[in-house]
UniProtKB/Swiss-Prot annotation:
Signal peptide start-end: none
Stretch list, region Disordered: 161-194
Pfam families per UniProt: Ribosomal_L15e
GO biological process annotation, one example: cytoplasmic translation
Organism: Methanococcus maripaludis (strain C5 / ATCC BAA-1333)
HAMAP family referenced in this protein's UniProt entry, alphabetically: Ribosomal_eL15
Primary gene name: rpl15e
Upper classification of the organism: Archaea, Methanobacteriati, Methanobacteriota, Methanomada group, Methanococci
Family affiliation: Belongs to the eukaryotic ribosomal protein eL15 family.
A GO-annotated cellular component: cytosolic large ribosomal subunit
Protein name per UniProt: Large ribosomal subunit protein eL15
InterPro entries for the chain: Rbsml_eL15_core_dom_sf, Ribosomal_eL15, Ribosomal_eL15_arc, Ribosomal_eL15_CS, Ribosomal_uL23/eL15/eS24_sf
GO MF annotation list: RNA binding; structural constituent of ribosome
Keywords: Ribonucleoprotein, Ribosomal protein
């Protein structure tokens, strides 16, 4: 088995491998860090490389922490019945992973999100590592596996739900029975003439 396979097997169930102790120590530092922080190298090298990471100029990995659970909505200042305030039990239509990708893109506006993966969670928050690519970097423009990102059609792809996490949330990972109303999008499908 290759080194990447050993790492992959260990991360399948982190609680049953050496990853548990590593995560326990790491998270103590992660909690003190800012919510979006650039890191030198990926925590899960197998997953990062599988999703398109290469150690070269123009590619950056960022760790993002996002709250767990439902949406944290502000309480209305004007009086309302508690039942109609809409504070508790409000869930975002986006996944937490998608929120993490968007926050990373907002922090680095000159870069495009390639992909992201889970690296840990505790009772309060989840951590994701987001792979960002600089489309203006010459080494990216000359690489066939990345230069498709340099086209204008991929600008702001994360906010348009074009990453893997975005497509999953829009129902575009499925085909056939049960997915008839997902294309071209849920909203556009309702507007189609019968």
């Amino acid at each position: 088995m290759s080194m990447y396979n050993y790492v992959k097997e260990a991360w399948k169930v982190p609680a049953n491998s050496y990853v548990k102790e590593l995560q326990w120590a790491r998270m103590q530092d992660w909690r003190k860090e800012p919510s979006v922080i650039r890191i030198e190298r990926p925590t899960r090298i197998d997953r990062a490389r599988n999703l398109g990471y290469k150690a070269k100029q123009g590619i950056v990995v960022v760790r993002v922490s996002v709250r767990r659970g439902g949406l944290r909505k502000p309480r209305p200042k004007h009086s309302k019945k508690p039942a109609t305030m809409g504070i508790n039990k409000i869930t975002m239509a986006k996944s937490i992973q998608r929120i993490a990708e968007e926050r990373a893109a907002k922090k680095y506006p000159n870069m495009e999100v390639l992909n992201s993966y889970w690296v840990g969670q505790d009772g309060k928050q989840k951590w994701y590592e987001v792979i960002l690519v600089d489309p203006c970097q010459p080494s990216i423009k000359n690489d066939k596996s990345y230069n498709w990102l340099c086209k204008g059609t991929h600008k702001g792809r994360v906010t348009r739900g074009l990453t893997s996490a975005g497509k999953k949330g829009r129902g575009l990972m499925y085909k056939g029975k049960g997915a008839e109303k997902a294309r071209p999008s849920v909203r556009a499908n309702g507007k189609k003439t019968k």
